[in-house]
């Protein structure tokens, strides 16, 4: 959530920045007018309350003097009625301002490339060289079916489209991947957490999914509960409405969880395979940091995600998202895109974002600065470390052999009971 004071005092700059995210200046102008009206009403209310207090004191004095107070009582009643009417108007204005501030996206950092969409993203670096096959590489969904480790047909029968069963060494591979990821993040100082997989609406508001993106979630009917779209939601809300000690920052959390997404806007996209599912496992990283340290922490978090891909020897590239492609809550985002041979393309496997104080303001997560003792909003960061199903897809395609088998990456073999190959 944006700071109304920042919008008020730096209006032109904020308007210019949000325009790069598709926010019409008319929206901010309307917000500015409503805010000005609110402040004018507040002045009137304070003036009327002061007058009412004066009249109240005069009534008390008149009663002590045994004087008639009818006129003064009538005047005080009129003042109270005016205050009540203005308070009601203020409540309506506050509701409108809240609607504005909770639906506006975060202000992009100065270092974010300006652009309309993903075509304006900027490649930062690449790692590894895509393998040159001397045979036609299969898509991971065909490999999975041929190996008997991925079953979309029965997933569709039991549930519906974009669901599947992992079987045998496929299930073992999925488990090996997320255990490996959690172990690697643990070495980097992350505390492993098992979170609730169901959260309340306040938590969804805190991280920015609600109210704007309700259609993308699975709500439990007639309850205040939602299936988590990512472990970011419970992790980032862990300290909601709390004040932390500044000396304890930064704090690192990691968790593996299922993620549930309706993919409301993705009809017709990635209808086959593991790239876009309604339910998938993901290892998440979340950080709580001081404002002056958060961008250094973003670079570290991105490196932590890269470490997984490097140890799995999967070629990838790092991309800085443009203002038009970033997520709602992000001030800056790096995407990691892994090479998918059958698509001859890089596909997203991780997003690492600094939300600055956007989520912290919504969730009221603060810290007491040990230097001056003041309570301040901290910065939150989140990143995929990594999407597990997409990692399975990348391994199947990059490690496939001409006979249809798939070599298991060396880093995962200790988690696979020493198995080296998945054979048909």
UniProtKB/Swiss-Prot annotation:
Pathway membership: Aminoacyl-tRNA biosynthesis; selenocysteinyl-tRNA(Sec) biosynthesis; L-seryl-tRNA(Sec) from L-serine and tRNA(Sec): step 1/1
InterPro entries linked to this entry: aa-tRNA-synt_IIb, aa-tRNA-synth_II, aa-tRNA-synth_II/BPL/LPL, Ser-tRNA-ligase_type_1, Ser-tRNA-synth_1_N, SerRS_1_N_sf, SerRS_core, tRNA-bd_arm
User: What are the recorded GO MF terms, alphabetically?
Assistant: ATP binding; catalytic activity, acting on a protein; serine-tRNA ligase activity; transferase activity
Q: Which GO terms describe its cellular component?
A: cytoplasm
Q: Which UniProt keywords apply?
A: Aminoacyl-tRNA synthetase, ATP-binding, Cytoplasm, Ligase, Nucleotide-binding, Protein biosynthesis
- Amino acids binding ATP: 261-263, 348-351
Give the UniProt subcellular location, in the record's own words: Cytoplasm
CDD domains recorded: SerRS_core
Which Pfam families does its entry note?
Seryl_tRNA_N, tRNA-synt_2b
EC number(s) for this protein?
A: 6.1.1.11
What are its GO biological-process terms?
selenocysteine biosynthetic process; seryl-tRNA aminoacylation
Q: Which residues bind L-serine?
A: 230-232, 284, 384
Taxonomic superkingdom:
Bacteria
How does the record describe its quaternary structure? Homodimer. The tRNA molecule binds across the dimer.
Outline what the protein does.
Catalyzes the attachment of serine to tRNA(Ser). Is also able to aminoacylate tRNA(Sec) with serine, to form the misacylated tRNA L-seryl-tRNA(Sec), which will be further converted into selenocysteinyl-tRNA(Sec).
| Record's comment describing the protein's domains | Consists of two distinct domains, a catalytic core and a N-terminal extension that is involved in tRNA binding.
Record's protein name: Serine--tRNA ligase
Write the gene name: serS
